[in-house]
């Protein structure tokens, strides 16, 4: 992603005039288990900030259905009290190579009942573990909706150049338990991809996510 696009996302995070103090989120960590046997863990540690913006260190690890590491990421995230955000991450994928990604989120609407956000991301893929494989880019975006912090839905799509692959996903979330310090969610969704040579069917997946806040 170009520097101008990254700066535009950063400005969107910082320039909003709406101030909703309850929107500030300080997530310490989360753990997810999926129906296909995969799992993941994520950690966010605030480094510095004020009453409007918080800069955090972030990290995550994903595991396959044999409980072996399938991806590890680390980076920085900037969160705004109005629900906007920007992140920069580096990812190592065993058997593939590395990824460098930037992502942005802009909150479009928020009140006591509804929360709607748009997101976009760009990833530079470097398949160093695959001989003679070229680097390529993945660009994508989507929308997230939440009703009363209880029921949510999301849609996203992404396109990878060189390999000419398109990915699509649709999902829903149901909050089962929430307290000031923790949250338990049930997730369900479908995903598919297509290339010039093959198109997958919609594949279902369900899982549970537990988050701890501080």
Swiss-Prot record:
Induction: By bacterial infection.
Gene Ontology cellular-component terms listed: extracellular region
Signal sequence segment: 1-19
Stored InterPro entries: Attacin_C, Attacin_N
Expressed in which tissues: Highest expression in fat body and hemocytes and to a much lesser extent in Malpighian tubules, silk gland and midgut.
Propeptide: 20-26
Main location: secreted
Location(s) in or outside the cell: Secreted
GO annotation (BP), single: innate immune response
Keyword Metal-binding assigned: no
Key words of the record: Antibiotic, Antimicrobial, Cleavage on pair of basic residues, Immunity, Innate immunity, Secreted, Signal
Stated family: Belongs to the attacin/sarcotoxin-2 family.
Role this protein plays: Hemolymph antibacterial protein. Has a wide spectrum of activity against both Gram-positive and Gram-negative bacteria.
Name the record gives this protein: Attacin
Species, as recorded: Bombyx mori
Lineage: Eukaryota, Metazoa, Ecdysozoa, Arthropoda, Hexapoda
């Amino acid at each position: 992603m170009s520097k101008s696009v990254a700066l535009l996302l950063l400005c969107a995070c910082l320039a909003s005039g709406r101030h909703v103090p309850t929107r500030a989120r300080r997530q310490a960590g989360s753990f997810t288990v999926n129906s296909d046997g995969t799992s993941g863990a994520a950690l966010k540690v605030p480094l510095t900030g004020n009453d409007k913006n918080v800069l955090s260190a972030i990290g995550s690890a994903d595991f396959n259905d044999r409980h072996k590491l399938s991806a590890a990421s680390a980076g920085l995230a900037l969160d705004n009290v109005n629900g906007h955000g920007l992140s920069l991450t580096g990812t190592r994928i065993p058997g593939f190579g590395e990824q460098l990604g930037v992502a942005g989120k802009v909150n479009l609407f928020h009140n006591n009942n509804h929360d709607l956000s748009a997101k976009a991301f760009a990833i530079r893929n470097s398949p160093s573990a695959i001989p003679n494989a070229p680097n390529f880019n993945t660009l994508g975006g989507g929308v997230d909706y939440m009703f009363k912090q209880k029921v949510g839905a999301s849609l996203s799509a992404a396109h990878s150049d060189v390999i000419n692959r398109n990915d699509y996903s649709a999902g829903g979330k149901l909050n089962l338990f929430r307290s000031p310090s923790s949250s338990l969610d049930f997730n369900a969704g479908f995903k598919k991809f297509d290339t010039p040579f093959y198109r997958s069917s919609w594949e279902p997946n369900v899982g549970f996510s537990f988050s701890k806040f501080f």
